[in-house]
Structure formats: structure tokens, C-alpha cells
Design a protein with these regions (language model features):
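A short N-terminal helical cap/helix-turn-helix that marks the beginning
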Residues: 50-60, 86-98
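Short amphipathic alpha-helix segments
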Residues: 39-47
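Short, conserved charged micro-motifs
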Residues: 34-39, 76-77
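Short, well-ordered beta-strand elements within core beta-sheets of diverse protein domains
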Residues: 24-32
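A generic structural motif
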Residues: 62-69
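C-terminal structural segments of small proteins and small subunits
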Residues: 70-95
Length: 98
């Protein structure tokens, strides 16, 4: 179940192939190499810090697995997760393979 802290409709729809499962938004992204994956993670980290909402993620060479959920809302999906997913989409567009 998705809950919105503000009870407003979602304004940001994720563009990456996000899967909703177990009250999380999940995706796995691939990059050219480790350096590109780490650069992406660094950009996301700065944006997440600004938003005060941080992903659960792991990196293995050129892959980044991301899980988004709101821990302080009982580990459920909220507007915060959808907003961060939208920012991750925006950042990923710079790195996406064509």
C-alpha cells in the first residue's frame, strides 16, 4: 500500500523501470563501468542528503541495486520515495546507455 504524508496525488512518476514490491520501490541499473556507477551514486547521495531521504542500495562493479521505502513511516511507500525516484531518474538519464 502506498501512503502519502500529505495525502495529495503523486506529482512525480518514476521513469526508470521501478518495481513495487514489499512496500518498496526497487530497480537495478547498469553502467559502463565501476567509475560511472560510483559517479551516479555520488550524485544521488548529494540529492538524497538535500531531500533528507536516503536510498538503501548496493553496488557491484557496474550495477547499482536501489530500494526506496520510508523507514520513519513504518517502512512503507510515501511521496518521499516517489520524489526521490524521480530525482534518481533525472540523474540516471545522464548515464543511461543508448
Amino acid at each position: 500500500t502506498i501512503h502519502s504524508a500529505t495525502r495529495e496525488p503523486y506529482k512525480t512518476k518514476p521513469k526508470i523501470m521501478w518495481k513495487e514490491s514489499n512496500n518498496k520501490l526497487k530497480t537495478t541499473l547498469e553502467f559502463r563501468d565501476f567509475g560511472e556507477a560510483f559517479a551516479f551514486m555520488t550524485e544521488v547521495a548529494f540529492q538524497a542528503e538535500k531531500m533528507n531521504h536516503h536510498p538503501d542500495w548496493k553496488n557491484s562493479w557496474n550495477r547499482v541495486e536501489i530500494n526506496l521505502t520510508t523507514h520513519d513511516a513504518g517502512d512503507t511507500l510515501t511521496e518521499k520515495d516517489h520524489r526521490l525516484a524521480g530525482e534518481i531518474d533525472r540523474i540516471y538519464k545522464k548515464y543511461a546507455k543508448h
